[in-house]
Structures are given as structure tokens and as C-alpha cells.
């Protein structure tokens, strides 16, 4: 009897695992459907070439290129094919590994998009809580605490627990929707991508600087970990 109960328990665990896995795949599919430009970031996260993904997904490389550039909309069928193609390209036998990698990449991209939306709102409203004029040029100064509070209230794909700022780098620690811990990092290349998103969103030239409080130049008159955004 005990063995029978244990067998049922194992079957239930496997069923829950599969259900959870399918839900994660649906999140990734929906992200590709709404934002096909994310495909490139997903490829880069899993270290997959465009030609390899084209082969495994059954989508031509030229079509894939147009999707990544935002010049073609994605359909449900394409989003599903790309998601399965990404998984097929991954060499590990553990299917959870690439899904977690993709969810981490999605969290990073959503963080960037949400941050860009936040900055755009500051500029549109002329919010003096963040905007300053330094040598007659507008500068946004966002403390770590304000960034944390805003992103917590806006970001849906993960629950943010804390944000750490170091020179030129942002680290975000939190949990996915299934309560698994996630850490995402924005280094120099990610911040460059974030600058481009800001420029596209605001129509302005943008330079982003990240400082721990001990390294903030005196001209900014703030003694906190902060993100400083020059826009003109």
C-alpha cells in the first residue's frame, strides 16, 4: 500500500512539473508573439546562432532576421516554432535549463522596457523629483531606493527583492512567478542596449551612468547609490 501511495505521489509530482513547464513555455511564447525583437536576446542568452535557430525552428533565416529587427510581426505559429527551436538548439538533456535561461533573459528585457517606460514618463511630466539642470542640460538622478520602488510596482514577470548598483553595473535580485530565485545583471553591453531603448522611447540622445554612493561625482550633489541619465 505504501509503495502504491508513493507511486501516485511521484506521478502527481511529474504532472505538476509538466504543467509548470508548459506555463513557463507559454510565457516565453507570448513574449515572442508580442515582441519578436526579443528573439535575438534569447539567442544570445543561449549562445545560438541565427542560422542554427532558423534550421531548428523551420523558419527561414531571412524571415527570422526581419522578426528580430521588428520589421515583421510574429504569429502564434511562429512564436511556438521559435520557442521549440530554441529548446532544440540547447544541448542539455534537462529541458528546465534552457527554459530558466530564457525566463532570466525575459526578466532582463522586461526590466529594461519597464525602466525605459519609467524614464519616458519622468521626461514627459517634467518630474522635478528626478530632473535637474546641470550646466543647462537636463539630467535625471534616480536613487537606488526610488528605482527599486518604481520597478517593484511596475514589473510583472518577477518579484524584485533588491537592487544593487556598482560602477557601470546594475544587479537585480528577485523571484520568478514560480518562486525560484533569479538574478539579472545589466553590464556595459546591456546598458548600451538600454540607452538605445531610452533614445527610441524619448526621441533624445541618452547616456546612462551607474554609481555607488562613494563614487558619485560632487557635481550631482547626491550621496546615494544612483543611476544618472543625461538626455538632450
From Swiss-Prot:
Transcription as a keyword of this entry, yes or no, is: yes
GO MF terms, alphabetically ordered: DNA binding
Q: What is this protein called?
A: Uncharacterized HTH-type transcriptional regulator MJ0529
Q: Which UniProt keywords apply?
A: DNA-binding, Transcription, Transcription regulation
Q: Which residues bind DNA?
A: 50-69
Q: Does the keyword Coiled coil apply?
A: no
Q: Which CDD domains match?
A: HTH_XRE
Q: Which residues form the HTH cro/C1-type domain?
A: 39-91
Mind telling me which Pfam families this protein's record contains?
HTH_3
The protein's organism comes out as Methanocaldococcus jannaschii (strain ATCC 43067 / DSM 2661 / JAL-1 / JCM 10045 / NBRC 100440) (Methanococcus jannaschii)
